[in-house]
């Protein structure tokens, strides 16, 4: 029992401290998943030993004490937390507990909502006017943030209509959309200021400003999710209440849906999880609430949460683990990237053992050392990265990360040009790592498209000394290729034929395949369409290169110096050729000067085909939405890009409208 008592005390202390850092200081030091694990362990101990549970236990509290810098506000109706489920089995058990509580067989209709990762707030309207806003605080007492909330454009200062209760308390989440968060951090980074780790911290930090002008400058948004005071004067459906709030001018998430039973909830969860990366805002799960208000009242509450609602958490996108070592990898352009070797940890649905540290500046910014406990984040398809260090757990034998001065692959000197954050190997194609990556890029589907020449084969070709430059690919024969691992005679003959077929290409593909720094597909296309021939491009001065659309000073210099090195285009001697490019008349390029962005799933055309078709008509196809975007093409499950385009008033096309425009 003494061991259990000791662990209970330790868990209470840890959760109290972590809760204070999360709710009060807006500076969480452990991932949500770690906090949830500790809380579940505490609840399990208290279930077996109820005598250990007191009114001061973290299991019956929500958040932490409010900051003394703000006036304290007592909530008339406590703002409780939610219990969690993490699997379909736990979801079914949640539904069964409610049936057992009601002592009858019943079919539940649930109001299902995304679980926004922001800051819960209470808004009090008196006679239709916003008179007070407060944070959740510890659930009983929050902090008054009225002046800051008044700066959030999504929150009405006066309710629309006239049929609202005389006193109405609206509850919801203040959050920062992904696009706004990224733009704000980019601006801060450019100014040498502190950046926020994630949108949740950014939203909370923005609301907790004593100067409301700072809050006003932040891209905050708000979605209502419930009613406190005054709710008894509204309808008997939770979803209906949200719709009523929307009619009065309070926004609700467009993803809110009514679903039947645990099976319907699970389907909602799976759908939102699949589209998580496309949503305009961060979420860490979904919330299920019994829709019928009379049933909510009958089910009641436990100490810290309602019995009629639960949060279904997604696989954690952030986890704690140990940084065991750092290796330095060399890329196609010589960029040296520090890669963290981690104690394997399950994050975002996969096991992670590596994470990028980006560059020397990022290592310095994080203050990370080998041996540290770190927080690693994996969101969607983004490469896992370390976002924070748990300095309190740093061991005495932690080691500084020393950036090498020589290439770890070829031994050439490393250099970092003034104004750049990237350190590069100066070895060029002498460096085996650069050689391999350059050849992989050259043969890629979007470049020379050598069918069957995968990464493993390229690595063998370089390791055996058969290929030193892309030009060497065209002198390979079937006998040489048949000597490679897992390469039979037939496969070797097929690969020789594929290499031979790749000699016929287009000038834009060839320019992209060369691997000139900063020259992507769009820039390669612009260069080809401007100069029409490789000879004209090679003869161009830096000033002439600057006349090409979207080519700035840095790109112009990269192109100029690259094409003046004979070995960079010796591949031409292998007989690579392309059809002549004809100067297009203005009538043939109706989208000239227009910038398009593609988002969501396209069904009529592949993304690459749509991009190529638009570029052929003179359009620029960008990867992100900005004020310079002319048209957004929105396919199925369009998310944050669509939301930003709507916010900026940009023209939005369906895929059918795009198809019609391409055929006209």
From Swiss-Prot:
Gene Ontology molecular function, alphabetical: DNA binding; DNA ligase (NAD+) activity; metal ion binding
Residues annotated as the enzyme's active site: 115
UniProt xrefs under Pfam families: BRCT, DNA_ligase_aden, DNA_ligase_OB, DNA_ligase_ZBD, HHH_2, HHH_5
UniProt cofactor(s): Mg(2+); Mn(2+)
Domain BRCT per the UniProt entry, residue ranges: 586-664
Residues holding NAD(+): 32-36, 81-82, 113, 136, 173, 289, 313
EC number: 6.5.1.2
Function: DNA ligase that catalyzes the formation of phosphodiester linkages between 5'-phosphoryl and 3'-hydroxyl groups in double-stranded DNA using NAD as a coenzyme and as the energy source for the reaction. It is essential for DNA replication and repair of damaged DNA.
Family: Belongs to the NAD-dependent DNA ligase family. LigA subfamily.
Full protein name: DNA ligase
Organism: Aeromonas salmonicida (strain A449)
Gene: ligA
């Amino acid at each position: 029992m003494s061991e259990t008592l000791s662990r209970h005390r330790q868990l209470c202390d840890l959760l109290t401290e972590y809760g204070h850092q999360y709710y009060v200081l807006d500076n969480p030091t452990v991932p949500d998943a770690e906090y949830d694990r500790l809380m579940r362990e505490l609840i399990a101990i208290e279930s077996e030993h109820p005598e250990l549970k007191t009114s001061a236990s973290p299991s019956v509290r929500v958040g932490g004490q409010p900051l003394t810098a703000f006036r304290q506000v007592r909530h008339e109706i406590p703002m409780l937390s939610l219990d969690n489920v993490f699997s379909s089995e736990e979801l079914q058990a949640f539904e069964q507990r409610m049936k057992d509580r009601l002592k009858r067989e019943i079919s539940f209709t649930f109001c299902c909502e995304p679980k926004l990762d922001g800051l819960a707030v209470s808004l009090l309207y008196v006679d239709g006017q916003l008179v007070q806003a407060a944070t959740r605080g510890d659930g009983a007492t929050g902090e008054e943030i009225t002046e800051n909330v008044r700066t959030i454009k999504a929150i009405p200062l006066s309710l629309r209509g006239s049929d609202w209760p005389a006193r109405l308390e609206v509850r919801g989440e203040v959050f920062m959309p992904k696009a706004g968060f990224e733009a704000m951090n980019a601006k801060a980074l450019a100014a040498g200021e502190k950046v926020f780790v994630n949108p949740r911290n950014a939203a909370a930090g923005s609301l907790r400003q004593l100067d409301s002008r700072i809050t006003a400058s932040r891209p905050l948004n708000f979605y209502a999710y419930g009613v406190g005071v005054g709710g008894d004067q509204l309808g008997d459906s939770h979803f209906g209440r949200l719709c009523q709030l929307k009619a009065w001018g309070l926004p609700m998430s467009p993803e809110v849906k009514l679903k039947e039973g645990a099976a319907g909830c699970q389907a909602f969860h799976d759908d939102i999880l699949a589209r998580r990366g496309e949503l305009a805002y961060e979420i860490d799960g979904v919330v299920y609430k019994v829709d019928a208000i009379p049933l909510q009242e009958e089910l009641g509450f436990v100490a810290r949460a309602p019995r009629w609602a639960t949060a279904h958490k997604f696989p954690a996108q952030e986890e704690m683990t140990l940084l065991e070592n750092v290796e330095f990898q060399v890329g196609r352009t010589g960029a040296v990237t520090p890669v963290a070797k981690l104690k394997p940890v399950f994050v975002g649905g996969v096991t992670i053992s590596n994470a990028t540290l980006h560059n020397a500046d990022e290592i310095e910014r994080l203050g990370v050392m080998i041996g540290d406990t770190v927080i690693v984040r994996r969101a969607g398809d983004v490469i896992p990265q370390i976002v924070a260090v748990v300095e309190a757990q740093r061991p005495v034998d932690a080691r500084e990360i020393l950036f090498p001065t020589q290439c770890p692959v070829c031994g050439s000197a490393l250099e970092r040009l003034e104004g750049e954050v990237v350190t590069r190997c100066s070895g060029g194609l002498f460096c085996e790592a650069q050689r391999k990556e350059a050849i992989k890029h050259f043969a890629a589907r979007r470049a020379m498209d050598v069918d069957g020449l995968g990464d493993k084969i390229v690595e063998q070709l370089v390791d055996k000394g058969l290929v030193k430059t892309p030009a060497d690919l065209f002198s390979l024969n079937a006998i040489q290729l048949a000597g490679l691992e897992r390469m039979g005679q037939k496969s070797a003959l097929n690969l020789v034929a594929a290499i031979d077929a790749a000699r016929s290409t287009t000038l834009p593909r060839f320019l992209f395949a060369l691997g000139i720094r900063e020259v992507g597909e769009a820039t390669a296309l612009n260069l080809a369409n401007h100069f029409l021939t490789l000879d004209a491009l090679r003869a161009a001065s830096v000033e002439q290169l600057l006349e090409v659309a979207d080519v700035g000073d840095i790109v112009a210099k990269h192109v100029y110096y690259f094409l003046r090195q004979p070995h960079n285009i010796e591949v031409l001697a292998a007989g690579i050729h392309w059809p002549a490019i004809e100067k297009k008349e203005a009538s043939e390029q109706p989208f000239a000067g227009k910038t398009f962005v593609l988002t969501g799933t396209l069904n009529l055309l592949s993304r690459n085909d749509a991009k190529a078709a638009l570029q052929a008509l003179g359009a620029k196809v960008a990867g992100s939405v900005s004020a310079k975007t002319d048209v957004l093409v929105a396919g199925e499950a369009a998310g944050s890009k669509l939301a930003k385009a709507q916010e900026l008033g940009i023209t939005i096309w369906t895929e059918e409208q795009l198809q019609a425009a391409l055929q006209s």
